[in-house]
């Protein structure tokens, strides 16, 4: 995989001004973004998140998932901490793409869970890859991470490229009546580390 750094700009947000670093995968043409806030240290653990693109949750405020809630909470946590990063990866629908995600939602409307829907369409439950994160983290100067995630695959991906995950920070937000079954499936079938104790509900 060939990841090329492109440019950096300011990104004003409700939580403060982030820096937005653009990257291009020259093999696939996909574009990825790293958001950074404050001064990042290569020696100290940095609060961060790997976030896969979710148009429906991040931009369209869908309650079918917890993605948008996680993104906003991660940005808020980073701003309150004073520094941190988010790697925003263009892997819509756990890697199956937007239109296939809508097809999967149609199957879920008929009773399939999120894993079954992907498999009925001929896809694995999770197609995401994380090999692009190494050059992105190298560019922003991060070697030790306090990782905001419930997904053990992301912790493993960090460790495999030599990034020390000093702490896994649970990010359980946004549970509501529309996504309760989805969250349960992520826990029971995809191995996400979640507990009722950590959940923040949304009405």
From Swiss-Prot:
Enzyme class, UniProt record, top EC level: hydrolase
Report the Pfam families cross-referenced here.
GTP_cyclohydro2
Keywords carried by this UniProt record: GTP-binding, Hydrolase, Metal-binding, Nucleotide-binding, Riboflavin biosynthesis, Zinc
Q: Which residues form the active site?
A: 126 (proton acceptor), 128 (nucleophile)
Q: How is the cofactor bound?
A: Binds 1 zinc ion per subunit.
The signal peptide annotation in the UniProt record is none
What cofactor requirement does the entry state? Zn(2+)
Q: What GO MF terms are annotated?
A: GTP binding; GTP cyclohydrolase II activity; zinc ion binding
Per the record, GO CC terms? cytosol
Task: Supply the EC number(s).
Answer: 3.5.4.25
Q: Which domain of life is it from?
A: Bacteria
Protein residues bound to Zn(2+)? 54, 65, 67
Catalytic reaction equation(s): GTP + 4 H2O = 2,5-diamino-6-hydroxy-4-(5-phosphoribosylamino)-pyrimidine + formate + 2 phosphate + 3 H(+)
Q: Which residues bind GTP?
A: 49-53, 70, 92-94, 114, 149, 154
CDD domains, per the entry = GTP_cyclohydro2
InterPro entries linked to this entry: GTP_cyclohydro_II, RibA, RibA-like_sf
| Protease among keywords | no
Q: Name its pathway.
A: Cofactor biosynthesis; riboflavin biosynthesis; 5-amino-6-(D-ribitylamino)uracil from GTP: step 1/4
Q: Which GO biological-process labels does this protein carry?
A: riboflavin biosynthetic process
Protein's job: Catalyzes the conversion of GTP to 2,5-diamino-6-ribosylamino-4(3H)-pyrimidinone 5'-phosphate (DARP), formate and pyrophosphate.
Write out the similarity annotation: Belongs to the GTP cyclohydrolase II family.
NCBIfam families linked: PRK00393.1, ribA
Return the protein name: GTP cyclohydrolase-2
Which species expresses this protein natively? Shewanella oneidensis (strain ATCC 700550 / JCM 31522 / CIP 106686 / LMG 19005 / NCIMB 14063 / MR-1)
Q: What is the lineage of its organism?
A: Bacteria, Pseudomonadati, Pseudomonadota, Gammaproteobacteria, Alteromonadales
Please state the gene responsible for encoding this protein: ribA
């Amino acid at each position: 995989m060939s990841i090329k750094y492109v440019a950096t700009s300011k990104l004003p947000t409700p939580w403060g001004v982030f820096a937005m670093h653009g990257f291009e995968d020259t093999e696939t043409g996909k574009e990825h973004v790293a958001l950074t806030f404050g001064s990042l240290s290569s020696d100290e653990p940095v609060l961060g998140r790997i976030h896969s693109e979710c148009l429906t949750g991040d931009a369209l405020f869908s309650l079918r998932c917890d993605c948008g809630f996680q993104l906003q909470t991660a940005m808020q946590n980073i701003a309150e901490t004073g520094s941190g990063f988010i790697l925003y990866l263009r892997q819509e629908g756990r890697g199956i793409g937007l239109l296939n995600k809508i097809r999967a939602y149609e199957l879920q409307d008929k009773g399939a869970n999120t894993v079954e829907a992907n498999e009925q369409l001929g896809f694995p439950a999770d197609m995401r890859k994380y090999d692009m994160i190494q050059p992105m983290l190298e560019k922003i100067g991060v070697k030790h991470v306090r990782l905001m995630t419930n997904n053990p695959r992301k912790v493993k991906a960090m460790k495999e490229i030599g990034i020390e995950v000093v702490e896994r920070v649970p990010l359980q937000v946004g549970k509501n009546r529309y996504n309760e079954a989805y969250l349960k499936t992520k826990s029971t079938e995809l191995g996400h580390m979640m507990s009722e104790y950590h959940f923040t509900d949304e009405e």
